[in-house]
Amino acid sequence: MIVTLTDQPFEPGVLVSAFCAGREETGAVATFIGLARAEQGAARALELEAYPGFTDAAITEIAQGAVTRFALQDVHIVHRVGVIAPGEAIVFVATAAAHRREAFEACDYLMDYLKSRAPFWKKEHGPEGPRWIEPTARDRTDAQRWDQEA
């Protein structure tokens, strides 16, 4: 399992290829790649803040829980911090399992956590200046469904 926070751009295709290499006992790999977007051209950049040692530990803990909950063989998470331009990759999540359902569900579970509960602080830089961004009601609802299924 790998959890990485980085302030450097990354190439998702390279990560997918590396994650899939040599997996003779794996039946399924699911991936998610999140990109920074400009809402109708409004955002010039997204800024993500994290506490080193705390944020990555929290993500590692939820990833370890996902390994157990979904019988995963492996997990790889890369999450950007710092200033991210529209179109750049923010997050990469890959899950490996014996079967597709577990890989898909685990990837979804991890993204719901990263989107709504992971200790990141998000600021959007737009034409009217910076503004802090909170998880949306939908983000919270998506994450809560996993609490009900536990």
UniProtKB/Swiss-Prot annotation:
Residues 124-150 are annotated as: Disordered. Disulfide bonds: none annotated. GO terms for biological process: Mo-molybdopterin cofactor biosynthetic process. InterPro entries: MoaE_sf, Mopterin_biosynth_MoaE. GO terms for molecular function: molybdopterin synthase activity. Converts molybdopterin precursor Z into molybdopterin. This requires the incorporation of two sulfur atoms into precursor Z to generate a dithiolene group. The sulfur is provided by MoaD. Heterotetramer of 2 MoaD subunits and 2 MoaE subunits. Also stable as homodimer. The enzyme changes between these two forms during catalysis. This is Molybdopterin synthase catalytic subunit.
